[in-house]
Amino acid sequence: MKFGIVARRDREEALKLAYRVYDFLKVNNYEVYVDEEAYIHFPHFSSEDVLSLKKMDVDMIIAIGGDGTVLRVEHNTSKDIPILAVNMGTLGFLAEIEPAETFFAISRILEGDYFIDERMKIRVFVEDVSIPDALNDVVILTSIPGKVTHLKYYVDGELAEDIRADGLIISTPTGSTAYALSAGGPLVDPRLHAILLVPLAPVALTARPLVVPDCSSIEIEVLTEREIVLTVDGQFYTQLPSNLKIRVEKSPRKTKFVRFSERIYPKYTLKIKKKF
C-alpha cells in the first residue's frame, strides 16, 4: 500500500505529526511520499520521497490540517484518491479523526478496518469551458464591494429566480456547512443527492435558498454590466466579464474519504453548534 502525506504548512504541530506518520510508515516498510510544500517548511523528510501533489500516485493520502488542507489535496491531485483527514484546523468539518487518534486510525487502515465515504462534487462551465470541480461550493460574487450584481438562474431550462444580490452560492450537501450555511442556507445531510442555490444578501426578501436534485442542470445568466468574481472551494479564483452564461451540474468525479463509522450524528451537528 502506498501513502501520500500532506500537512498544513503554517502549523508546526501539523508538520511534526506528518513527520511522525512518515517515520512510522517507513519503519514498517510502506512506500510513502510527502507533499513538497510540507518538505519546504519542514525539511526533515528524505528528499527522495518528496513529490508534488499533482504527481502523487498513491492508494491513500493522509491530510493533516483543516478543511483548507483537504480542499488543497482535492484541487491538486489528478485521481480520486481516498483521503484520511486529520483535524488540525479550526473546526474540521471534513475531518474524520483528531490528532491523538492518528496512529490508532492508521493501524486500523493497515488491517483493512475502514470504509470509503464518497461525496458528490459539482462541475462548472463558463461559456462551455470547464474549470475545476468543487467539493464544497462555487460562488459568483460582485467584483466591487457594495455594488450588487444582477443574476437570473434556471433549473433544467425553467426560470427559478431573478435576483439582485451580492452574489450566489451553488453548493453540494458537503458544502452546506461552509459558506452556504453562513449565508442562511439550510444544513443538508451529506448523504442526500442535491444541489443548493443560496443568494448572497439579496435585495428582495422573497429570494430564498433553493434545494434541487443533483441531476439538475443549472444555468446562471450574469446580466450586470461589470465584471464578476467566480470562486471554486476558495481555492480557485477568476474574474469574468459581464453578460455571460455559467452552467453548473453534478460532476462525474467524487471525493473519497476514509471513514471508520457510518454514524453521521451527533458529530455532524455538534460541529455546527461549535461553529456558532
Curated annotation (Swiss-Prot):
Pfam families: NAD_kinase, NAD_kinase_C. Its EC number is 2.7.1.23. Its cofactor is a divalent metal cation. NAD(+) binds at residues 67-68, 72, 136-137, 147, 164, 166, 177-182, 201, 235. It is an enzyme of class 2 (transferase). It comes from the Archaea. It is found in: Cytoplasm. GO terms for biological process: NAD metabolic process; NADP biosynthetic process. One of its GO terms (molecular function) is NAD+ kinase activity. The active site is at D67. Keywords: ATP-binding, Cytoplasm, Kinase, NAD, NADP, Nucleotide-binding, Transferase. It catalyses: NAD(+) + ATP = ADP + NADP(+) + H(+). GO terms for cellular component: cytoplasm. NCBIfam families: PRK03708.1. Involved in the regulation of the intracellular balance of NAD and NADP, and is a key enzyme in the biosynthesis of NADP. Catalyzes specifically the phosphorylation on 2'-hydroxyl of the adenosine moiety of NAD to yield NADP. Belongs to the NAD kinase family. This is NAD kinase. It comes from Thermococcus sibiricus (strain DSM 12597 / MM 739).
